[in-house]
């Protein structure tokens, strides 16, 4: 590359903004990758904490259930103790002996001791319940494995305490059983002392009682005899039913055999008809074989004719393919001839275009030299004008470098054009063939025009980038002036203390602050290039804040779920009351898809409907003699269970009004 005296030498410049931008982008990508990694690790830790929290809550619920059961047992023992104490007082009043009084006093003392022990156990259970609730709340806020281990140890300690208290409760139950036995003995002694001498009235009552027992015994024998008769009748009915089932089975087998016989008869008729048709075809064939040829000979000749036809079809296909190939070759030759003619015309026109292009390039060269002079003169004028200001040396050097590069490329292009023209002249002198000379000149003109187009496109690109840079600089300066001239005014707006929008803005502001601090520390750690595998404290604080937000959200969800459960229970009770008041049945939904219906007129009677097996169970048949008839009519025949229930309600209402 040739250089003039005015062109400046190459100067080392700092890294370009594009390189720094790429470096910053790589750093940002690295930080984003590390941020995503931290997010995934935090999510995994949160899921582990949720699983541990669910396990602790399950253990807490189990512990609370055991505590409730122990408390219920304690209350039951307390009630039994009170009842035994009352019975002991009654036995003390009834028994006149000193031994009975001493036993009653001892029993009363043991009852008081058991009551005191029961109260102590109840207080211990309440304390354990409070400690278990505190442990459950502490377990819900635990964030590490050590806290979970401590809570599990505490739960094991509570379980051991509960087992110990259950053992004590069982011992108290045994003692209560012993006291009940003693009270029963005292009652028996009191009864013996009160009934040692029987009067005449008692003897008469005993006789009446004996006669009543004899009558009941006779009645039971009659009922037993009637039961035996019914059993024999039932056995005879079962034998008849079995014989009827056997006859029905034999009848179905005979019917199946009869149907098979009909099918075989139909098949025999079809075969006979087919035989007749085949005999007719055979007679027709005998008419056509007058020359004595058999069907095998005819089939052989037909197969030979098919093979010959296939061979002829294959030959015709090959000939058709050869003909198509000849047509394609003829078309290709005609196309090549037309292309050669067009190429000849293009070669002739390219000579004229080269002459015009050479003249235009000379003109552009002169114009580019003049443009370079004008640009350098403008740069000098700008440098004289900007002497009082602080110039941007980097932009000036860049513009000056662009001008020098443009000038050098123009000179290189001119020299290359001269060399190409000299080579063209030498080839034209050495080679007398006009076709080869025309081809070489076409190649040189094509290369020259391609290089010129590339330089023009590059020049336009540089001009466009320069204009964009100037426009961006002017916009940034305008924004800077507006920001400097902006006077902020503080506006106070009256808001609620627990405003959801303000709370959301506070959460977002805190998250933004934590993320900025985390980004700054990560950038500092990345710039320092520390080899330690550690994360800054801001990352941990930000993750802790996210966990706190999730816990708040979980608390609100649990609160909402509890409210919905309460509402569901209340609405269920309202539904049951509405059904009871409208239909007259109190519904009780049991496990296994069963529904227990209690009528309002007979609360000691019920109907149990099993919706899975479609069965109905009731004890109303004892008060309704027409129960079986109604069941067969409305349920078995009409399949109308609502009508059956309405009929039951009408009958119960009539019976209650008549009573």
From Swiss-Prot:
Subcellular location: Nucleus
Pfam families, per database record: MAD
GO biological process, one term: attachment of mitotic spindle microtubules to kinetochore
Ranges where the record places region Disordered: 1-24
Record has Ribosomal protein as a keyword: no
Biased composition, class Polar residues, residue ranges: 1-10
Coiled coil: 23-531
Keywords from the UniProt entry: Cell cycle, Cell division, Coiled coil, Mitosis, Nucleus
Source organism, top-level taxon: Eukaryota
Cellular component GO terms, alphabetical: kinetochore; mitotic spindle; nuclear envelope
Protein purpose: Central component of the spindle assembly checkpoint.
Protein family per UniProt: Belongs to the MAD1 family.
Protein name (record): Spindle assembly checkpoint component MAD1
């Amino acid at each position: 590359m040739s250089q003039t005296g005015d062109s400046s030498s190459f100067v080392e410049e700092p890294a370009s903004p594009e390189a720094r931008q790429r470096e910053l982008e790589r750093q940002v990508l690295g930080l984003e990758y590390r941020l995503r990694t931290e997010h995934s690790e935090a999510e995994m830790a949160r899921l582990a904490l949720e699983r541990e929290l669910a396990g602790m809550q399950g253990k807490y619920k189990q512990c609370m259930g055991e505590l409730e059961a122990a408390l219920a047992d304690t209350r039951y023992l307390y009630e039994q103790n009170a009842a035994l104490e009352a019975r002991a007082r009654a036995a003390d009043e009834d028994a006149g002996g000193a031994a009975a009084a001493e036993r009653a006093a001892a029993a009363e003392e043991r009852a008081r001791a058991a009551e005191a022990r029961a109260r102590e156990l109840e207080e211990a259970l309440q304390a354990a319940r409070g400690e278990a609730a505190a442990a459950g709340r502490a377990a819900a806020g635990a964030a590490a494995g050590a806290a979970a281990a401590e809570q599990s140890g505490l739960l094991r300690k509570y379980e051991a305490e509960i087992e110990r208290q259950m053992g004590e409760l069982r011992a108290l139950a045994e003692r209560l059983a012993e006291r009940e036995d003693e009270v029963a003995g005292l009652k028996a002694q009191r009864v013996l002392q009160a009934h040692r001498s029987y009067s005449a009235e008692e003897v008469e009552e005993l006789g009446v009682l004996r006669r009543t027992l004899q009558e009941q015994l006779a009645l039971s024998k009659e009922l037993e005899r009637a039961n035996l008769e019914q059993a024999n009748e039932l056995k005879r009915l079962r034998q008849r039913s079995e014989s009827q089932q056997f006859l029905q089975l034999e009848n179905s087998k005979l019917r199946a055999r009869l149907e098979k016989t009909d099918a075989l008869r139909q098949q025999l008729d079809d075969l006979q008809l087919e035989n007749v048709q085949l005999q007719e075809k055979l007679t027709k064939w005998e008419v056509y074989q007058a020359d004595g040829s058999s069907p095998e000979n005819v089939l052989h000749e037909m197969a030979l004719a098919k093979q010959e036809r296939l061979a002829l079809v294959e030959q015709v296909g090959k000939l058709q393919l050869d003909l198509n190939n000849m047509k394609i070759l003829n078309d290709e030759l005609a196309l090549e001839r037309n292309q050669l003619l067009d190429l000849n015309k293009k070669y002739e026109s390219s000579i004229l275009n080269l002459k015009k292009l050479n003249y235009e390039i000379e003109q552009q060269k002169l114009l580019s030299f003049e443009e370079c002079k004008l640009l350098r003169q403008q740069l000098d004028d700008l440098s004289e004008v900007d002497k009082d200001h602080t110039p941007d040396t980097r932009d000036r050097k860049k513009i000056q470098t662009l001008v020098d590069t443009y000038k050098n490329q123009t000179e290189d292009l001119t020299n290359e054009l001269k060399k190409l023209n000299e080579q063209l002249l030498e080839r034209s002198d050495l080679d007398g063939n006009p076709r080869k000379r025309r081809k070489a000149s076409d190649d040189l003109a094509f290369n020259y025009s391609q290089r010129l187009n590339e330089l023009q496109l590059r020049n336009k690109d540089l001009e466009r980038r320069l204009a964009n840079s100037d426009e961006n600089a002017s916009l940034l300066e305008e924004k800077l002036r507006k920001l400097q001239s902006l006077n902020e005014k503080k506006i106070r707006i009256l808001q609620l203390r627990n405003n959801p929008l303000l709370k959301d803005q506070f959460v977002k502001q805190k998250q933004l602050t934590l993320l900025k601090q985390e980004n700054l520390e990560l950038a500092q750690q990345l710039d320092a290039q520390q080899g330690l595998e550690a994360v800054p404290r801001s990352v941990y604080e930000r993750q802790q804040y996210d966990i706190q937000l999730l816990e708040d959200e979980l608390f609100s969800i649990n609160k909402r779920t509890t409210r919905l459960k309460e509402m569901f229970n209340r609405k269920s009770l309202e539904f049951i009351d509405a059904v009871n008041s409208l239909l007259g049945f109190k519904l009780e939904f049991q496990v296994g898809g069963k529904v227990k219906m209690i009528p309002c007129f007979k609360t000691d009677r019920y109907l149990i409907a099993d919706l899975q097996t479609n069965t109905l169970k009731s004890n109303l048949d004892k008060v309704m003699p027409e129960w079986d008839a109604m069941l067969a009519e409305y349920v078995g025949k009409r399949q109308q269970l609502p009508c059956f229930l309405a009929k039951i309600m009408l009958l119960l209402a009539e019976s209650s009004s008549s009573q």
